[in-house]
Amino acid sequence: YAKINLANAIEELDLLEKKVESVIKTECDNARAYLENRIKNFFHEELINKLYRKIDPHPDFKSVRFKANFDSDHPRLDVFVENIKNENVLIPNLYFSTAQINILSLSIFLASALNSKEYDCIFIDDPIQSMDSVNVLSTIDLFRSIVVNEGKQIILSTHDENFHNLLMKKMPPNLFDSKFLELEAFGKLRAN
């Protein structure tokens, strides 16, 4: 009689274990889907891609994607770039140049700033580090577009005099509500 009770108890435990495993799997799948959706909304993936394409840092990889990775005990967020046909997927920090990584970072930052309803002013320190001249021009055009079309104010600081001069040419104070300041000496500014 004890063997039968033990066998029944084991069978009942097996059934309960399968039910619990099924519930846990369903809850994990729901949590994963929820987190993936929250990540997509938090990072404003569509806007990041729109901004990223405007600067155009890479000839093939035009799309950015964020993916939560739950495959290990320590979940993490992975960032990928994809080509137009979504055939090749890369982890940018392994294959991109410093300039391309900076452009990706700038796109992520600007998307977050543009989605802010509380702030109309964006502060950026030296946004063109390591960029070539084409990307610098595209970045200035993007800034100009943000100021004109999105109604945001952008305050830039840079040590690059060429970038400063290029900004003054592409966003002159007489056509835009722009102002350019230079640090003349310690604590002393000069307006252009």
Predicted regions and their residues:
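Extended, charged coiled-coil "arm/hinge" scaffolds of SMC/Rad50-like chromosome-maintenance ATPases
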Residues: Y1-K85, Y119-F123, S138
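Conserved RecA-like P-loop NTPase ATPase core
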Residues: Y52, L104, S157
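Flexible loop/turn segments at secondary-structure boundaries
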Residues: D73, A113, S130-D132, N162-N165
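GG-anchored amphipathic helix commonly corresponding to the ABC/SMC/Rad50 NBD signature/C-loop
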Residues: N83, T98-C121
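Short pre-catalytic strand/loop immediately N-terminal to key active-site residues, enriched for Gly-Thr
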Residues: V89-L94
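ABC-family nucleotide-binding domains
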Residues: D125, Q129-V136
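C-terminal lobe/lid and adjacent interdomain/linker elements of RecA-like ASCE P-loop ATPase modules
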Residues: V136-N192
